Amino acid sequence: MANIPMDIITDLFLRLPASTLVRFRVLSKPCFSLIDSPDFIASHLNHTLQTGDHLMILLRGPRLLCTVDIDAPDKVSDVEHPLKAGGLTEVFGSCNGLIGLSNSPTDIALFNPSTRQTHRLPAEIVDFPEGSTTRGYVFYGLGYDSVSEDYKVVRMIQCKGGKADELVFGFPYEIKVFSLKKNSWKRIKRVLPAIQLLFYFYYHLLYRRGYGVLACNSLHWVLPRRPGLIAFNTIIRFDLASEEFEILDFPESLAHENIDIGVLDGCLCLMCNHEFSYVDVWIMKEYKVEGSWSKLFRVPKPKSVESFDFMRPLLYSKDRDKVLLEINNAKLVWFDLASKRFRKLRIKDCDSSYSVELLVSSLVLGCRGDPNEVKRRKERRAREDKLMQQSNKRDDFLSKGFKLVL
């Protein structure tokens, strides 16, 4: 490759999956420097996001964590992750090739399955509000703040115990945000009174036990209606740039329906389940503009499922004639928008229930995930150079010694 111009090599490398590029780093020092450079990592990610190439599905089940190539469902790869232990590790989000992993509120990591790079978050204790002694539910969110070019993790904890158990409704809460750039946590104290009231008096978030939905530089959750307590649904958003909560408007006609949220084609979408017989999918074409919500399509209950409890659109096919749907955390099906027919996506050796995340192939965390990685790499290279020099001196000594004997 020494005779190939570097710009041609760069253009070629941009089209390759991250797992291949990791192996290509050993080809030469220029290749190593190129693939590890922040500029190339960013360019490779942008190219992958724009083209939709090397897109994978991450499956998470009771004893399962694997990636599946969407274009080749028989290509299944088990994921060995750093938090693997006897307990059940949660996968609480996917963003630019990274996934969030958690064994507990103080044992969290960012992990890139394509490169196997890991960043363990510093353990952050729970600052229990006065009168609370234990934690209840824990809700997470993972996202990329394009304003500060930083990956962030949101951790929200419902606290209970002591005087908190005497409350008629709900419990106090704690919210903290982790910044990868700063490698530190920050407590969020300023919350709008309306949201503070919702959090304090009733705290039950939808979407996978409260995993935030990332769209338009914000994480989103649904606070569902609760008969006898709260009569309407609420969507809250956490702006990753300002690190503030807001209430997001959506069609008033859906305020009393069974709803959930997701992302389709980069836009926030809303799924309205009508008596578990069909689901209407709405999309917000212009973010934070209530009038931009429009009903996109309707999905009838498939004959192959007994109940239609949960449905989420994941992505369009390349010809945009079909949509890949996740149904009941157990099935992946292609839904033809014209014929309204379903076709199951069959995955090799996978018949159990699972949750799904979309995953892109990226080099994120490749060179700067761990703040000490660059330092360790330099030290490792220095040791290797020293060993090489010692080896060369020994070879010179032996060759001179043999000459003397001869």
Residue ranges of model-derived segments:
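N-terminal entry/capping and adjacent linker segments that precede and initiate structured domains
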Residues: 1-406
